[in-house]
From Swiss-Prot:
Keyword Membrane: yes
Subcellular location: Endoplasmic reticulum membrane; Cytoplasmic vesicle membrane
Pfam families from the UniProt entry: Syja_N
The protein, known as: Phosphoinositide phosphatase SAC7
Principal place of residence: endoplasmic reticulum
Role this protein plays: Phosphoinositide phosphatase that preferentially hydrolyzes PtdIns(4)P. Regulates the accumulation of PtdIns(4)P on membrane compartments at the tips of growing root hairs leading to proper root hair development.
Gene: SAC7
Natural source organism: Arabidopsis thaliana
Biological process terms in GO annotation: response to wounding; root hair cell tip growth
């Protein structure tokens, strides 16, 4: 695979000099290139020949960094985002891949000293979100190869495109720091522009007979409607869906390279599930009259990018999910044709909670589509022998747990087909017949599912023990119970702030002085005083006082204690009922505005 022109090659080793009034980013890879000078006063940038001299007044702090992710501008200051720690996790088509282990946000906000107090206060609120952003997980990058494109799309690129800087080759929807790079792009700093994807990257190498086979699984998360589980559901008016992830499985052996791509994404019409302290908030379809147009736009985009599309819907046909399932099926009746097909498979009804081997029923229904649309294959000379002509699009409600089990099954079946085509497997041979290979392959998909799930829900994937071990385990069931409780807590009491941080980082919310300095509308009624920790404290204390008073009813003042017991019980029940009836108000909700566009 050809890579970027050496003239546009990224700096792989950098040294950061933190002076009181400026940041200097010095290439430390022996290239002799210019240094990047960034003002800590106004965030202006320029290239300089060498690092300025230090003295007793200007003593710099020096550290190694591994890339410049970008810059964000808030009300008064700007903030530089850099990679301070990373680890190599494998290779993509022969090129090293690294995972971001630590992000650091560096303020360029000295001008804030002269700002009005109200502006300083607002700046502090926004900068707190950046500390949340520093904890972003699942970020990967390469200095040499474009991670945003699949193997097939990389192969189809022309020589002229391959000579461009990596950021210019990148697929914008999978470029996690697309918005943050804009300032650096404007300053023509190509060698400092590090493209980053969010998703997962896992690989392993194993021997099958005399052959060494390398298997890679890479996920690319779309940034168009990125967010948290409960605050990003369904689609927007442009047809971009929540939790859209492209998963590519690559096998390399004896010079052959073969890949197979699948996608997942939320049901492509407008629906929501707003948290309200209940375990399963009800589903609501929004603007149902727009559903057909939105779904049509979504699938036309998929067809343009991937070819034929088979939409596999895994949601329940009954209960709360049933309404969404019915709407999806109705919408698809107007869209399906030769190139777009829809198939419903009630995962829970057919497989229950333990019989996931029944997914073979689904495979029998989609096998024809997979055979017809195939996979991508290059021979030892780098010549294209096959190309993938279509894609399976899977979804459940979250596009996490059921989806990951299903995608791992499809990936396994297609890998066996690829290995037979390359000549590694015989006609009747399967992955299961090679125990070491089978074990590593299960772990590969389980880790993939966990990482995608953590980014969207905050916890590892449910049902992951089946993917990891091939069957359900008692430990896996207990782990799923704990993860479900954690999801409940995060959804209700943490994800609103996390959603704001995501929107800020990816440019879905642009900070503007004219808007963000305007007076905040005064909250009225219950919303002005709603505070869940305080309400919980009142409920618990009321319960405690009611219990203590009840214990004293046998004393001389039993009527008095009985009265207080009933009083505290009433307060306890009343507060609990108030919180339950107004659950949405007591939850942690996003505070920023609509996405741009």
């Amino acid at each position: 695979m050809e890579t970027v022109d050496s003239r546009n090659k990224l700096h792989s080793r950098l040294r950061l000099w933190e002076f009181p009034d400026q940041y200097i980013i010095e290439p430390a890879d022996g290239s002799g290139s210019s240094c990047l000078d960034i003002s800590r006063v106004d965030a202006s940038m320029k290239l300089i020949d060498q690092v300025p001299e230090s003295n007793s007044v200007r003593v710099p702090k020096i550290r190694s960094i591994f890339g410049v992710v970008g810059m964000l501008k808030l009300l008064a200051g700007s903030y530089l985002v850099v990679v301070t720690e990373s680890e190599r996790v494998g290779s993509f088509l022969g090129h090293p891949i690294f995972k971001v282990t630590t992000l650091k946000v560096l303020p360029c906000d000295h001008s804030l000293k002269n700002s009005p107090e109200e502006q300083k206060k607002m700046e502090t609120e926004f900068s707190k979100l950046l500390s949340v952003a520093e904890k972003t997980t699942g970020l990967y990058f390469s200095y040499e190869v474009n991670l945003t494109l699949s193997s097939q799309r990389l192969h189809e690129m022309g020589d002229e495109s391959k000579s461009l800087p990596l950021w210019r080759q990148a697929e914008p929807r999978f470029l996690w720091n697309n918005y943050m790079l804009e300032v650096l792009i404007d300053n023509k700093l190509d060698q400092f522009l590090l493209p980053v994807i969010q998703g997962s990257f896992n690989s392993f190498e194993t021997a099958i007979g005399r052959d060494i086979v390398d298997i890679t699984l890479i996920a690319r998360r779309c940034t168009r409607r990125n967010g948290t589980r409960m605050w990003r559901r369904g689609a927007d008016l442009d047809g971009y869906v929540a939790n859209f992830v492209e998963t590519e499985q690559i096998v390399q052996m004896n010079g052959y390279t073969s890949s197979f791509v699948q996608v997942r994404g939320s049901m492509p019409f407008m629906w929501e599930q707003v948290v309200d302290l209940t375990y399963k908030p009800k589903f609501e379809i929004v603007q149902p009259e727009e559903a057909k147009r939105i779904a049509e736009r979504h699938f036309l985009d998929l067809r343009k990018k991937y070819g034929s599309v088979l939409a596999v819907d895994l949601v329940n046909k009954q209960g709360g999910e049933g309404r969404l399932c019915e709407k999806y099926a109705t919408v698809m009746q107007h869209i399906t044709g030769d190139d777009i097909r829809y198939l419903h498979f009630d995962f829970h009804q057919i497989c229950g909670h333990i019989h996931f081997e029944r997914l073979s029923i689904l495979y029998e229904q989609i096998e024809g589509f997979l055979e017809k649309n195939g996979y991508f294959l290059l021979n030892e000379k780098g010549e294209k022998m096959k190309e993938q002509l279509g894609v399976v699009r899977s979804n459940c409600i979250d596009c996490l747990d059921r989806t990951n089990v299903t995608q791992s099954m499809i990936g396994r079946k297609m890998l066996e087909v690829q290995l037979k085509r390359i000549g590694v497997f015989g006609a009747e041979e399967t992955i299961s017949s090679h125990l070491n290979f089978d074990e590593h392959y299960k772990i590969l998909w389980a880790n993939h599912g966990d990482e995608i799930s953590i980014q969207y829900s905050g916890t590892p994937a449910l049902k992951g023990d089946f993917v990891r071990y091939g069957h359900r385990t008692a430990h896996g069931v207990l782990k799923d119970g704990w993860s479900s409780l954690r999801r409940y807590y995060l959804n209700n009491f943490a994800d609103g702030t996390k959603q704001d941080a995501i929107d800020l980082l990816q440019g879905h919310y642009i900070v503007a002085v004219s808007r963000d300095m305007a007076p905040v509308p005064q909250k009225g009624g219950l919303e002005a005083v709603a505070n869940f920790p305080v309400a919980l404290f009142v409920v618990l204390m009321s319960f405690w006082f009611a219990t203590m008073s009840l214990k004293q009813t046998g004393s001389d003042y039993k009527h008095k204690h009985l009265f207080f017991s009933l009083l505290w019980t009433g307060i306890c029940v009343g507060m609990a009922a108030l919180v339950r009836a107004n659950g949405r108000i007591f939850c942690n909700r996003p505070r920023l505005h609509k996405p741009r566009g």
